[in-house]
Design a protein with these regions (language model features):
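Hydrophobic faces of well-ordered beta-strands that scaffold small-molecule active sites
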Residues: 15-21, 45-49, 74-78, 103-105, ...
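Metallocofactor- and cofactor-centric catalytic cores in central/energy metabolism, strongly enriched
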Residues: 55, 378-504
């Protein structure tokens, strides 16, 4: 059992030190000096090696690990940015060869240069990647991400719904997005304790200064309120040294508070050399001698965010106050009507039981559609109908029934299981639209279909199935040309076909079915 797995299993508080690999001997030397300490205040130390934080051309986590002169306990990251299933399987084999068995799986933030409508960029979604990895490596320690720092109901509730899917898909622990709102930290912990099988939570932290706050404005999903920026600016006005000292003291205080709340550990970002590490350790030693309960901690945390002449800090964006459990929103009449119309059409044409559906199924499974020209014509017909109406990209295996008729391809990342962590007040990370998963949440809530958002684990789309009609395989799964169902763990295709052939008809959607650069942290759903 690995050090991190041991610590989580034994309920030992753990410190995960984030390292973003760059081709710099100084950075590697600094990391090795920190990791040589092996502990932070007696807590076991593990390095987390980031993946594609800046660009796909960054040094890979495996190459970075291999570059270390001394082997250290390591948690590698896998980012789904511009990746397919095969890329993940290759990394698993390479990790086997290196003797590594711990992986933090992320969908990833926006790939630099990715512009919707230009070159398609695929993101291997974390839920599907977790399924693939869990089935391929059942004994590995797998983590995923959760961003609880959401202040509108749609994006916040959808985050927790997707987190439930991640647990079902095989996550052993969740690492939170970087954040400073202690009420949101407690909210996430209370949510986890209500799950059927609670898992450990690790909080991502960074010592926050005015300069870093400005940088975080460009990090998807990170929240630094105007109130926080005012206080950080006031600290800098005193002196840079004063601001730096306050940031380290706050970081130490936050670590202590999270430990008292019941977090399994912390994921520390932005500590780049031994001097910073030692300064944090000294601050922790001092404050541990003074603070022993949450009742003692809360006023100390509030005081750490006070400056003369400024009001008390508020961590939430102005006018946005949602907390888990609050129910305020509903789908518009248009959104509800759209769902009911499309659900009705689906029942007529695709439920496989009424005469119209059987006739349509017979028509689209004729041998003529398996010729090159026939397949091309059928693909063009389906695309011409569904793309203007739904944003469809003819992925070859239609998932509309599982997504309340809101096409996953209308998300710039193509995410089907729920939102990434990069939304801001319901706005997509790309900034050009409302997050489609916020619309999906409102719709599900209004039509009593929220179970769909937690129970249906939607596999990724295999590359060979893209840009062909989904209709023939909907009615006759034996017609599929996909080499292996994504997330199958490599089950032979003939078995998958046999299961599909003998499975009962798929229910209507009326019924739920169980089941850039410059980034200090890459935690994203």
């Amino acid at each position: 059992m690995s050090q991190l797995k041991d610590a989580l299993h034994e309920h030992t508080f753990v410190c995960v030190m984030e390292f973003v690999p760059k081709p710099s001997a100084e950075r590697f030397a600094a990391l090795e000096a920190i990791m040589a300490r092996k502990q932070l205040c007696g807590w076991p130390l593990t390095v987390a090696i980031g993946d594609r934080v800046g660009s796909p051309l960054d040094m890979s986590p495996l190459d970075a690990f291999s570059s270390l002169d001394t082997a250290v306990p390591a948690l590698l990251h896998f980012s789904g940015k511009d990746r397919e299933r095969q890329d993940l399987l290759v990394q698993l084999k390479r990790m086997d060869n290196a003797g590594l068995d711990q992986l933090l799986i992320l969908s990833g933030d926006r790939l630099p240069g990715h512009q919707p409508g230009q070159r398609p960029v695929r993101y291997l979604e974390s839920v599907a990647a977790l399924q693939i990895t869990r089935q391929a490596r059942p004994d590995w320690l797998l983590g995923a991400a959760l961003n609880p720092f959401k202040y509108h109901e749609e994006e916040g509730a959808a985050q927790y719904f997707k987190a439930e899917k991640k647990l079902s898909a095989g996550a052993d622990f969740l690492t939170l997005q970087m954040g400073y709102d202690d009420r949101k930290h407690q909210e996430a912990l209370h949510w986890m304790r209500r799950q059927r099988t609670p898992k450990p939570l690790i909080a991502c932290l960074m010592a926050l200064t005015h300069g870093r706050a400005k940088m975080l404005e460009h990090v998807a999903g990170a929240v630094v309120s105007p109130s926080m920026r005012d206080i950080l600016a006031a600290e800098l006005d005193v002196s840079k040294a004063f601001a730096q000292t306050r940031s380290i003291e706050r970081l130490a205080l936050q670590v202590i508070g999270l430990k008292l709340m019941g977090y399994a550990g912390v994921h520390l970002s932005g500590i780049h050399d031994l001097a910073q590490f030692q300064a944090l350790e000294q601050a922790l030693h001092t404050q541990q001698g003074e603070i022993h309960t949450l009742e003692q901690w809360a006023p100390a945390w509030a005081a750490s965010w006070q400056m003369p002449g400024l009001p008390a800090v508020t961590f939430n964006p102005p006018g946005a106050h949602w907390r888990l459990g609050e129910s305020r929103v509903s789908a518009s009449r248009t959104e509800q009507a759209r769902y009911h119309v499309l659900s009705g059409l689906h029942s007529l044409l695709f439920d496989r039981s009424n005469w119209l559906s059987r006739s349509f199924g017979w028509a689209v499974t004729r041998p003529v559609w398996r010729t090159a020209q026939g397949a091309r014509l059928l693909h063009q017909l389906e695309r011409s109908i569904k793309r203007p109406l739904l944003g469809c990209d003819t992925c070859g295996r239609c998932r509309l029934e599982d997504t309340l008729y809101i096409c996953p391809e209308s998300c710039p990342k193509g995410l089907a299981n729920g939102p990434c962590g990069g939304t801001s007040l319901n706005r997509c990370e790309f900034g050009d639209r409302e997050c489609v998963h916020s619309v999906k949440y409102r719709t599900a809530k209004s039509v009593q279909q929220t179970a769909v958002l937690t129970d249906r684990l939607i596999p990724c789309i295999e590359l060979p199935t893209r840009h062909q009609s989904s209709w023939p395989t909907w009615f006759d799964p034996t017609l599929t040309t996909t080499p292996e169902p994504c997330g199958s763990g490599g089950a032979p295709l003939r078995l998958a076909r046999e299961e599909a052939r003998t499975a009962p008809p798929k229910p209507s959607a009326h019924h739920s079915r169980p089941a850039h650069t410059k980034q200090p942290a890459e935690i994203d759903s």
